[in-house]
From Swiss-Prot:
<dbReference type="InterPro" id="IPR036113">
    <property type="entry name" value="Asp/Glu-ADT_sf_sub_c"/>
</dbReference>
<keyword id="KW-0648">Protein biosynthesis</keyword>
<protein>
    <recommendedName>
        <fullName>Aspartyl/glutamyl-tRNA(Asn/Gln) amidotransferase subunit C</fullName>
        <ecNumber>6.3.5.-</ecNumber>
    </recommendedName>
</protein>
<dbReference type="GO" id="GO:0050567">
    <property type="term" value="F:glutaminyl-tRNA synthase (glutamine-hydrolyzing) activity"/>
</dbReference>
<comment type="function">
    <text>Allows the formation of correctly charged Asn-tRNA(Asn) or Gln-tRNA(Gln) through the transamidation of misacylated Asp-tRNA(Asn) or Glu-tRNA(Gln) in organisms which lack either or both of asparaginyl-tRNA or glutaminyl-tRNA synthetases. The reaction takes place in the presence of glutamine and ATP through an activated phospho-Asp-tRNA(Asn) or phospho-Glu-tRNA(Gln).</text>
</comment>
<comment type="subunit">
    <text>Heterotrimer of A, B and C subunits.</text>
</comment>
<keyword id="KW-0067">ATP-binding</keyword>
<dbReference type="InterPro" id="IPR003837">
    <property type="entry name" value="GatC"/>
</dbReference>
<dbReference type="GO" id="GO:0006450">
    <property type="term" value="P:regulation of translational fidelity"/>
</dbReference>
<dbReference type="GO" id="GO:0070681">
    <property type="term" value="P:glutaminyl-tRNAGln biosynthesis via transamidation"/>
</dbReference>
<comment type="similarity">
    <text>Belongs to the GatC family.</text>
</comment>
<dbReference type="GO" id="GO:0006412">
    <property type="term" value="P:translation"/>
</dbReference>
<dbReference type="GO" id="GO:0050566">
    <property type="term" value="F:asparaginyl-tRNA synthase (glutamine-hydrolyzing) activity"/>
</dbReference>
<keyword id="KW-0436">Ligase</keyword>
<dbReference type="GO" id="GO:0005524">
    <property type="term" value="F:ATP binding"/>
</dbReference>
<keyword id="KW-0547">Nucleotide-binding</keyword>
<dbReference type="Pfam" id="PF02686">
    <property type="entry name" value="GatC"/>
</dbReference>
Length: 95
C-alpha cells in the first residue's frame, strides 16, 4: 500500500501534528514501508496458533485483600497542585 504526501498531511492534521512540507515525502515513504511490512505479516498462516499476551508464561503473585482505614489525607494531598476539603481539585474536562 502506497501512501502519498497528501495522505501524510491529512493524517498529521487529524493528529494535530505540525510537520513541515519537506518532511512529508520522506514520512510517506517510511509509512508505506511500514504498511508493506504489515501486509507481509498478514500473509503468515496463524491458524491454530493460540493468542498470547506475553512470550513468557508467568503467574502474578497474589496478596491478601485487606481493608484499611486508607491513607492520611494530608500525606496523600501533600503533592497535589490544588486540593479542597480533602479532595484533589482538577480542571473541568466535561462541558
Amino acid at each position: 500500500m502506497a501512501i502519498d504526501a497528501a495522505t501524510v498531511r491529512k493524517v498529521a492534521r487529524l493528529a494535530r501534528i505540525a510537520e513541515p512540507e519537506e518532511k512529508l515525502e520522506p514520512l510517506a515513504k517510511e509509512l508505506s514501508g511500514i504498511l508493506n511490512w504489515i501486509e507481509q505479516l498478514n500473509e503468515v498462516d496463524t491458524d491454530g496458533v493460540e493468542p498470547m499476551t506475553t512470550s513468557v508464561e508467568t503467574t502474578l503473585p497474589m496478596r491478601d485483600d485487606v481493608v484499611t482505614e486508607g491513607g492520611d489525607p494530608a500525606k496523600v494531598l501533600a503533592n497535589a497542585p490544588k486540593a479542597a476539603k480533602n479532595f484533589f481539585v482538577v480542571p473541568k474536562v466535561v462541558e
